């Protein structure tokens, strides 16, 4: 292609900058076609000796250009993108549908994956600037566009005034389980005897009363407004079925043969269409019974296994895995900017909640919202959080099913059909419905496939993504989101006994979402002031990532950026350690103790009487002795600056004055020797070999957030030992203000004001604890 697209970096980091989004695409033309502007102060003389005709400058009326209209660049860029989309297309599409499909495939499903930036995210794609804003691309909605349109049960969540109380989970609650039709043979879809219609309910005639939502006494404010706003009888439930290719093979080789279109040329091939795969004679021989009732019950059981139970079994195997539950809760902490993710954002000063991903590709989207739940309280907050997690589970499962569907080829389906035929008798003669479902799940959803999908899922999402998904579902159901306050989870029953079997998968995901909301401590706000600002009671945060419970971690955060441990200068392989916010945050995000994570039970640390199974340690400096020595050095330095120092000292972080001496105190200052500080400095100097050895063991470690300079370091004295004067071993003759010592001291973090002189005695008796932090020249 003759022309390429580039995207220059915006001049400003703010989203309101005009160069950040619009107009960021520039077209690189050939050098022959480029117009080079000359300096108006000097004109190059023509080579042929003839004077060139001067070009009239652009006036105010035609500042957009004459022959080379700048507005044509927009059309040129768009035509370049369209030309690239049809570069490998045989022939030109004749319909709008073919044009849209090819254009979207080039934008969202390119042959070459997007390049990664240094921070791990994908680089911005300028080709997307011409795609309709806020439109859902059909190329991306491979599995998310399928729905199960079904009548809303009268026993749905919206018609249960005590739904919030029923869904409340206490400490010790376990993860929800699945059921089978043998365990729940009868279904109740009524309103219930405990529910009473509201006295002020709108009266409607029987012909007009097609609304499933009933106004009840005890409805919360949101549901009361919802029931007076809309009238619905059916809802588009997102599809949770197994891939169609798999289900077609299972139906054709286990239950009933699919009916194909009639072929008049070969009528013998159409004779078995629509017939059961297993005849009555074969089934009677396998079961050793000719009772018609027994045979009919067995056929009902196999139909329930294929249509309902095996789907529930695959859902439970995928989501109930401890590693998957941990990753789901981590994604929820990012989506709600909660717990340890909020703590990491605060210390690193990087908004980690801007990271989103899809199918393993990481993106940075600063337009997403992650604090919308903070505007709600009480039952409204719990309903919103529960619905967000419910949609997140649906989105994760649909993504997995889409990947599974796209990977299957004819060769794989033929092998699957062989397995089904080989195990047909074993499946039909299984002990129970749950046993048959487990055996069938082992065939169609093997362990290798499940682990592969679990390794790539779930994705990082934001609340804005879930809100768009919510609006997409409601619009497909004929509900206008702007005029109602409906949630998709309002139309799902709360228990299997009140839910029709085709919706059992949605009932399981709603119950699982409620469990995850309680297990992640998202239902209530447990944070407070001070150290409790980012507190979360879940097993991912407390006690190992909590600054309240882990004192070693708190001590480590207090020495971030205050020191640098240097190894021997001439020794090969010597490593230094500087605890920067980026290094600490990377280690903090990776810190996970599986022994104290209870995936299948709500078991908060504050509700336990026993100590944690693993010791509470810091992230980078895991030895408490080294951490205590660093904290003692920092404390000694601060005490010296506040009590014995002269002049005005500034805080390295806030710039505030740490001590402001009065005129009388400044006049009475005399050179004094501080034996206590010397003792402290010599004691700290003996700990350096041990600290240097620890620095090599810990290593510097790579950080995903980039490196940031520290604010202090350990440096050697004149003879290579800490605690000694930099002017030599004895520190005899002090130098004046113009000497080398003053030039080194002038660049420290705690600077002396020029208006206050320093005496020679003071320069001689500065303790080592204060000189160890002079890392910035």
Curated annotation (Swiss-Prot):
<dbReference type="GO" id="GO:0039606">
    <property type="term" value="P:symbiont-mediated suppression of host translation initiation"/>
</dbReference>
<keyword id="KW-1193">Eukaryotic host translation shutoff by virus</keyword>
<keyword id="KW-1075">Inhibition of eukaryotic host translation factors by virus</keyword>
<feature type="region of interest" description="Disordered">
    <location>
        <begin position="261"/>
        <end position="283"/>
    </location>
</feature>
<dbReference type="GO" id="GO:0030430">
    <property type="term" value="C:host cell cytoplasm"/>
</dbReference>
<feature type="region of interest" description="Disordered">
    <location>
        <begin position="652"/>
        <end position="777"/>
    </location>
</feature>
<keyword id="KW-0426">Late protein</keyword>
<feature type="compositionally biased region" description="Polar residues">
    <location>
        <begin position="9"/>
        <end position="20"/>
    </location>
</feature>
<keyword id="KW-0143">Chaperone</keyword>
<comment type="subunit">
    <text>Monomer. Interacts with hexon protein; this interaction allows chaperoning and trimerization of hexon proteins. Interacts (via N-terminus) with host initiation factor EIF4G (via C-terminus). Interacts (via RRM domain) with viral mRNAs that contain the tripartite leader; this interaction allows ribosome shunting and expression of viral late mRNAs.</text>
</comment>
<keyword id="KW-1035">Host cytoplasm</keyword>
<dbReference type="GO" id="GO:0003723">
    <property type="term" value="F:RNA binding"/>
</dbReference>
<feature type="compositionally biased region" description="Gly residues">
    <location>
        <begin position="728"/>
        <end position="738"/>
    </location>
</feature>
<keyword id="KW-1155">Translational shunt</keyword>
<comment type="function">
    <text>Protein that inhibits host translation while promoting late viral translation by ribosome shunting. Blocks host cap-dependent translation by binding to eIF4G, displacing MKNK1 from cap initiation complexes and preventing EIF4E phosphorylation. Binds to the tripartite leader sequence of viral late mRNAs and recruits host eIF4G, PABPC1/poly-A binding protein and 40S ribosomes subunits on viral mRNAs, allowing ribosome shunting and efficient translation of late viral mRNAs even though conventional translation via ribosome scanning from the cap has been shut off in the host cell.</text>
</comment>
<feature type="compositionally biased region" description="Polar residues">
    <location>
        <begin position="656"/>
        <end position="665"/>
    </location>
</feature>
<dbReference type="GO" id="GO:0039657">
    <property type="term" value="P:symbiont-mediated suppression of host gene expression"/>
</dbReference>
<dbReference type="GO" id="GO:0043657">
    <property type="term" value="C:host cell"/>
</dbReference>
<keyword id="KW-0488">Methylation</keyword>
<keyword id="KW-0694">RNA-binding</keyword>
<feature type="modified residue" description="Phosphotyrosine; by host">
    <location>
        <position position="649"/>
    </location>
</feature>
<keyword id="KW-1190">Host gene expression shutoff by virus</keyword>
<keyword id="KW-0813">Transport</keyword>
<dbReference type="InterPro" id="IPR003381">
    <property type="entry name" value="L4"/>
</dbReference>
<dbReference type="GO" id="GO:0039704">
    <property type="term" value="P:viral translational shunt"/>
</dbReference>
<feature type="region of interest" description="Disordered">
    <location>
        <begin position="1"/>
        <end position="55"/>
    </location>
</feature>
<comment type="similarity">
    <text>Belongs to the adenoviridae shutoff protein family.</text>
</comment>
<dbReference type="Pfam" id="PF02438">
    <property type="entry name" value="Adeno_100"/>
</dbReference>
<keyword id="KW-1262">Eukaryotic host gene expression shutoff by virus</keyword>
<keyword id="KW-0945">Host-virus interaction</keyword>
<keyword id="KW-0597">Phosphoprotein</keyword>
<dbReference type="GO" id="GO:0019060">
    <property type="term" value="P:intracellular transport of viral protein in host cell"/>
</dbReference>
<protein>
    <recommendedName>
        <fullName>Shutoff protein</fullName>
    </recommendedName>
</protein>
<feature type="region of interest" description="Binding to host EIF4G">
    <location>
        <begin position="250"/>
        <end position="314"/>
    </location>
</feature>
<feature type="domain" description="RRM">
    <location>
        <begin position="317"/>
        <end position="435"/>
    </location>
</feature>
<feature type="compositionally biased region" description="Basic and acidic residues">
    <location>
        <begin position="753"/>
        <end position="763"/>
    </location>
</feature>
<feature type="modified residue" description="Phosphotyrosine; by host">
    <location>
        <position position="334"/>
    </location>
</feature>
């Amino acid at each position: 292609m003759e022309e390429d697209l580039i995207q220059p970096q915006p001049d400003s980091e703010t989203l309101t900058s005009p160069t950040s989004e619009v107009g960021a695409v520039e077209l690189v033309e050939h050098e022959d076609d480029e117009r080079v502007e000359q300096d108006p102060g000097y004109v190059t003389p023509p080579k042929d000796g003839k004077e060139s005709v001067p070009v009239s400058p652009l006036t105010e009326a035609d500042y957009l250009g004459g022959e080379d209209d700048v507005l044509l660049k927009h059309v040129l860029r768009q035509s370049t993108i369209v030309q690239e989309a049809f570069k490998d297309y045989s022939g030109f599409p004749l319909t709008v549908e073919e044009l849209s499909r090819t254009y979207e495939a080039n934008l969202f499903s390119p042959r070459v994956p997007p390049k990664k930036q240094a921070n791990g995210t994908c680089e911005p794609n300028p080709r997307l600037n011409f795609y309709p804003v806020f439109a859902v691309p059909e190329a991306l909605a491979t599995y998310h566009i399928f729905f199960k349109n079904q009548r809303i049960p009268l026993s749905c969540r919206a018609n249960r005034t005590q739904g919030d109380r029923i869904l409340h989970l206490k400490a010790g609650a376990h993860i929800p389980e699945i059921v089978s039709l043998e365990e729940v043979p009868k279904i109740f879809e009524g309103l219930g005897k405990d529910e009473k219609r509201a006295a002020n309910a709108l009266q409607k005639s029987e012909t007009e009363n097609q609304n499933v939502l009933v106004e009840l006494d005890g409805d919360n404010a949101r549901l009361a407004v919802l029931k007076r706003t809309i009238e619905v009888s059916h809802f588009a439930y997102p599809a949770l079925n197994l891939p169609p290719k798999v289900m077609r093979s299972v139906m054709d080789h286990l239950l009933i043969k699919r009916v194909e279109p009639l072929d008049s040329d070969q009528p013998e091939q159409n004779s078995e269409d629509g017939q059961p795969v297993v005849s009555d004679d074969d089934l009677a021989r396998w079961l050793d019974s000719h009772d018609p009732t027994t045979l009919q019950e067995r056929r009902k059981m196999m139909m329930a296994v294929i249509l309902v139970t095996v789907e529930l079994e695959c859902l439970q195997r995928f989501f109930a895995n401890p590693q998957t539950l941990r990753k789901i809760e981590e994604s929820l902490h990012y989506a709600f900017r909660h717990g340890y993710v909020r703590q990491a954002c605060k210390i690193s000063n990087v908004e980690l909640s801007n990271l989103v991903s899809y199918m393993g590709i990481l993106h940075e989207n600063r337009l997403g919202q992650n604090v919308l739940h903070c505007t709600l309280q009480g039952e409204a907050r719990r309903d919103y959080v529960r619905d967000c997690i419910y949609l997140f589970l649906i989105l994760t499962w649909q993504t997995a099913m889409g990947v599974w569907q796209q990977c299957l080829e004819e060769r794989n389906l033929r092998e699957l059909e062989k397995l089904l035929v080989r195990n047909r008798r074993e499946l039909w003669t299984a002990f129970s419905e749950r046993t048959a479902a487990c055996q069938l799940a082992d065939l169609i959803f093997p362990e290798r496939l499940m682990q592969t999908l679990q390794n790539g899922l779930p994705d990082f999402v934001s609340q804005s993504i879930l809100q768009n998904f919510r609006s997409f579902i409601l619009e497909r159901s004929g509900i206008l989101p702007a005029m109602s306050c409906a949630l998709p989870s309002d139309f799902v029953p709360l228990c299997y006994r009140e839910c029709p079997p085709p919706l059992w998968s949605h009932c399981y995901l709603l119950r699982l979402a409620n469990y995850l909301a309680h297990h992640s401590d998202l239902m209530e706000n447990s944070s407070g002031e001070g150290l409790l600002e980012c507190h979360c009671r879940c097993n991912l945060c407390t006690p190992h990532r909590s600054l309240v419970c882990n004192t070693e971690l708190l001590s480590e955060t207090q020495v971030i950026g205050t020191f640098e441990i240097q190894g021997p200068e001439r020794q090969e392989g010597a490593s230094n350690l500087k605890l920067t916010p980026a290094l600490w945050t990377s280690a903090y995000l990776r810190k996970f103790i599986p022994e104290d994570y209870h995936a299948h039970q709500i078991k908060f640390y504050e509700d336990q009487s026993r100590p944690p199974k693993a010791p509470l340690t810091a992230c980078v400096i895991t030895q408490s002795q080294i951490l205590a020595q660093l904290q003692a050095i920092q404390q000694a330095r601060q005490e010296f600056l506040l009590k014995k120092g002269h002049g005005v000292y500034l805080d390295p972080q806030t710039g505030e004055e740490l001590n402001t001496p009065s005129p009388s105190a400044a006049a009475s200052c005399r050179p004094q020797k501080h034996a206590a500080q010397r003792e402290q400095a010599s004691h700290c100097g003996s700990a350096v070999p041990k600290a240097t050895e620890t620095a090599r063991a810990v290593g510097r470690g790579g950080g995903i957030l980039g490196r940031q300079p520290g604010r202090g370091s350990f440096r050697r004295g004149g003879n290579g030992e800490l605690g000694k004067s930099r002017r030599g071993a004895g520190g005899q003759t002090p130098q004046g203000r113009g000497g080398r010592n003053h030039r080194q001291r002038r660049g420290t973090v705690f600077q002396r004001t020029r208006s206050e002189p320093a005496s020679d005695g003071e320069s001689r008796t500065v303790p080592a604890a204060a000189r160890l932090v002079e890392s910035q020249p």
